[in-house]
Every structure is written in structure tokens, then in C-alpha cells.
Amino acid sequence: MHMIMTAEAQIKDYLELLSSKAPVPGGGGASALAGALGDSLGQMVVHLTLGKKRYAQAEQDMLNYERELKRLQQEFLMLADKDAEVFAPLAECYRLPSSTEEEKAYKEKVMEERLVQASYVPLEIMEKAAEMLGILKELAEKGSVMAVSDVGVGVQFARTAIL
């Protein structure tokens, strides 16, 4: 099984692994990466807004958004790898024997436990994406009007991370 550090991966290598038969990365990691991409667009809008006279009244807000978005981006990348960590043991369950009733019962029990464990990371990704949506809403209202379409794309990435 290939493990990949999402933050360190080349885009091409990550996409190749994502499109392979390997169980990880998968949808959870991809949704976290979508969150990180949307976050990056939010940071871009902040940087396009900072230092502009027209947006001087929003300078402190922009600095706060920048700090929060940097934190969220790191969390998205960490969650992409964490998703692979918690999904790998679940994927191994499919290889457990299930010839006898005892084996079937054991496999079912272990799969249920690992499914529960694996479900927490996607929930965290959704929570972070929802938090990011709040910041993106503020950026749409207070950020550079020249970058409002970038905020819109960031919102779509956040929605992808939630779905």
C-alpha cells in the first residue's frame, strides 16, 4: 500500500496515485485537498486586498482571515493524510476470512469498529470546510472586487469538501 504525504507530494504524483487501484488516497483525501485548494484561493484574495487604499478599512480583517486560512490549510493537508491512515485498516478488513459463522461475525464486528473510526476524519473535513465558507463569505463582501470570482471558485471547492 502506498502512503503519501499530501503536503509534500507533487500534484502529478498525487493524481496518479489517486487514480490507481490503491485504497488510499481516496475520496476523503481528495475532499480535504479540495478544501486546501479553496483555502488557497481565499488566501490569494486576502493578498490581492492587503495594502490597497480602497480596502484600508478591511486591513485588520484581512490579516485575521489570512491567519485563519493558513491554519485551516494546514489542517486540511493533515486531514488528507489522516484520512488515508484511518481508511487503510478498514480496507484490510475486506481480506479477513469469512468462511465460518465465527469468522463472519468477527469480520462484521471489526469492520463496524473501523468504519466508525474512519468516519471521524470526513466529519472533521466538513467542519473545517464550513468554517472556511464563513471566511469566504466575508472575503466576498470585504475583499477585492477584482477577485470575487476567485472567492466563488473557493466556495465551490469548500462545497466539494463538505459533500
Predicted regions and their residues:
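Short, Lys/Arg-enriched N-terminal segments with co-localized hydrophobic residues
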Residues: 1-4
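Amphipathic alpha-helical interface segments
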Residues: 83, 87-156, 160
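A structural-propensity feature for long, helix-poor, extended segments
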Residues: 53-92
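Short, hydrophobic/aliphatic alpha-helical segments
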Residues: 6-24
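Transmembrane signal-anchor/signal-peptide helices with a preference for the extracytoplasmic
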Residues: 44-56
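Short alpha-helical scaffolding segments that buttress acidic/His motifs in well-ordered protein cores
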Residues: 15-18, 34, 41, 45, ...
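Conserved phosphate/anionic-ligand binding catalytic regions in large, soluble enzymes, centered on
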Residues: 20-41, 147-162
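Amphipathic alpha-helix face/heptad-repeat signature
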Residues: 33-37, 65, 72-79, 118-128, ...
